[in-house]
């Protein structure tokens, strides 16, 4: 399970060091893909394969499904962390997420998200006040 908030730096070569506590879960390979709110999602390879299989079952006659599958496939990059736990984020991914040197990696239960630190702070300011209401609306009787 991926939990917590971490603040790694992006180096000049576009490399980001993954939090040490997640490296074992990601050692078999990982998939970096464009996600919502201009963040990046990092999935263990096996979890991403399951997600892609489910998504590919959508009817190809549906234009939204086709667009989603195209964006998912085109916006995904397979990575293997190096011996220091670093992954290289593509220029396209860095541009999409507006990543600067200061990044935030958050655990999102079954995957990680990578954010630009300022974008994450802005997101938090907007959404923190509505956290209680959102949990009631989105999660209903679960909590």
UniProtKB/Swiss-Prot annotation:
It is found in: Cytoplasm, Nucleoid. The keyword Nucleus does not apply. GO terms for biological process: negative regulation of DNA-templated transcription initiation. Keywords: Cytoplasm, DNA-binding, Repeat, Transcription, Transcription regulation. GO terms for cellular component: cytoplasm; nucleoid. It comes from the Bacteria. InterPro entries: MraZ, MraZ_C, MraZ_dom, MraZ_N, MraZ_sf, SpoVT-AbrB_dom, SpoVT-AbrB_sf. The keyword Cell wall biogenesis/degradation does not apply. Residues 5-47, 76-119 form the SpoVT-AbrB domain. GO terms for molecular function: DNA-binding transcription factor activity; transcription cis-regulatory region binding. Pfam families: MraZ. Forms oligomers. Was identified as a high-confidence drug target. Belongs to the MraZ family. This is Transcriptional regulator MraZ. The lineage of its organism: Bacteria, Bacillati, Actinomycetota, Actinomycetes, Mycobacteriales.
């Amino acid at each position: 399970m991926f939990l917590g908030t971490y603040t790694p730096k992006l180096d000049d070569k576009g490399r980001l060091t993954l939090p040490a506590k997640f490296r074992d879960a990601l050692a078999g390979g990982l998939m970096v893909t464009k996600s919502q709110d201009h963040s990046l999602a990092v999935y263990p390879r096996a979890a991403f394969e399951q997600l892609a299989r489910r998504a590919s079952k959508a009817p190809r006659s549906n234009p939204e499904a086709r667009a989603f599958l195209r964006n998912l496939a085109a916006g995904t990059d397979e990575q293997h962390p190096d011996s220091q736990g670093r992954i290289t984020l593509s220029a396209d991914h860095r541009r999409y997420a507006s990543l600067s040197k200061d990044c935030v990696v958050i655990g999102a239960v079954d995957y990680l998200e990578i954010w630009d630190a300022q974008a994450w702070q802005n997101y938090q300011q907007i959404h923190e006040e509505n956290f209680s209401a959102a949990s009631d609306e989105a999660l209903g009787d679960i909590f």
